[in-house]
């Protein structure tokens, strides 16, 4: 029996006003999630928290699974934009600083300024994400890594695509697995998570310098 089609957003905001509305919806979604969990998230509650009519919310999200789907994509797009801004575009940093930024952005789940995505959201991801969506995210991240290293004109010899894909898989896969298992310390002050990110930075640097 084929799987039921997953809910997804009805449309993407293109105008400034609609982008503002959708961002407000996501902000309300996160506030309700933090206060009441997934069970507390309803389209009516999100509309009330946002201060919009339920019908306006339905213009974008037919149900709360579609809202979760849109929010997950929002998290990915925010991360990709941050990688572009901090690790790909700058021309006044050396390769070591560029790589540190790239690894930290890829690994760190607690970076200020990026939308929150936690263990509980990961546990619900299967409701809205298919294998093709995971592959799309990986391909987008791989493109950023390749572009970031292409900008490392002072790193010679340049690492091979196979090396970069292996390092990305370790960094991104490790990030997601740590969200899944929640190692002791990650749920408290995050010190273990910060230590892991530093170890990943050191591992990537060691691999690049060992060639």
Residue ranges of model-derived segments:
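N-terminal intrinsically disordered/low-complexity leader segments
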Residues: 1-20, 184, 211
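Helix-turn-helix
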Residues: 20, 24, 28, 32-66, ...
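Membrane-embedded alpha-helical bundles of multi-pass transporters/translocases
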Residues: 22, 54-56, 72, 80, ...
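Short hydrophobic clusters on alpha-helical segments that form packing/core surfaces
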Residues: 25-33, 75, 79, 106, ...
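Alpha-helical DNA-contacting segments of helix-turn-helix folds
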Residues: 68-75, 83, 137, 141
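Hydrophobic alpha-helical connector segments
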Residues: 70, 84-112, 164-168
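Hydrophobic alpha-helical bundle segments that form small-molecule/ligand-binding pockets
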Residues: 86, 92, 112-114, 118, ...
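Hydrophobic/aromatic-rich alpha-helical bundle segments in the mid-to-C-terminal region
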Residues: 131, 135, 150-203
């Amino acid at each position: 029996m084929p799987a039921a089609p997953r809910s997804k957003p009805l449309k993407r905001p293109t105008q400034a006003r609609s982008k503002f509305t959708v961002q407000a919806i996501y902000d309300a979604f996160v506030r309700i999630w933090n206060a009441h969990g997934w069970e507390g998230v309803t389209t009516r509650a999100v509309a009330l928290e946002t201060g919009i009519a339920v019908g306006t919310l339905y213009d974008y999200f037919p149900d709360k699974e579609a809202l979760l789907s849109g929010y997950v994509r929002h998290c990915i797009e925010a991360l990709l934009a941050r990688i572009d801004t901090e690790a790909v575009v700058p021309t006044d940093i050396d390769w070591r600083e560029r790589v540190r930024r790239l690894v930290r952005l890829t690994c760190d789940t607690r970076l200020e300024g990026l939308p929150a995505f936690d263990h509980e959201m990961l546990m619900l991801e299967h409701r809205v994400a298919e294998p093709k969506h995971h592959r799309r995210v990986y391909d987008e991240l791989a493109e950023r890594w390749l572009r970031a290293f292409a900008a490392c004109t002072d790193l010679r010899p340049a690492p091979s695509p196979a090396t970069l894909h292996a390092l990305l898989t370790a960094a991104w896969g490790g990030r997601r697995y740590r969200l899944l298992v929640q190692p002791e310390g990650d749920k408290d002050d995050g010190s273990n998570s910060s230590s892991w990110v530093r170890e990943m930075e050191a591992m990537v640097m060691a691999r690049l310098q060992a060639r």
